[in-house]
Amino acid sequence: MQITRELIVERLGSVKYDRFLFYLMGPYKSFNLNYILSEEERCEIDIEDLPGPLRHLFQNRDEINEAKALLRRIQGELRAEPGVNAFLALDVDVNTDDVDAVTQSIEYTRSSNATAFVVPFLGHNFGVGEEAGSVLETLAETHGDRLVFVHESDVTSAMIRSAKVRWDLRVETYETEAELVAKLRRFAGGIMQRERRGDLDRLD
């Protein structure tokens, strides 16, 4: 299966700016044990027997679900105002048996007018994950102006710092959800203006 702008637009609901695709990435999927274990298997595991990093995953399931819910709320805000076609990878509904998750993320970023990596504080620090790293490695040089990394002010990560230096990545912080939404709206608006002026190529 080939992931294209047309495929993405076709699978998303309609908004004012259907052709302005804003891909939202977050840490929820990489750390969600539902992808690996059944409910029965999770119930049988004694959390105290697990090594530290895995113990964190089990203890913070609610926070991981909240991270996904946060992305959904942000998506709704951006689709309402300014009306851009904000989406999560799950919305395009491409089976990972057909295209693996990392390749999907790279292609969604390549097809999108804007991409944001959103990293809330989950009670501990994780890296940005394999998908984000692969996206940056593949597309930072050609799509760097369309990428932003926004993390909650409590998040400290060596990978974020190195990504900023290595790929000249735009990094923003936020303290409240309202501030996060405002920054993403400004980012989308800035890209729209640059496309209209011809500073950035139009993708259609």
Q: Which residues does each predicted region cover?
A:
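Conserved catalytic or regulatory cores that recognize and/or transform ribose-phosphate-containing ligands
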Residues: 1-204
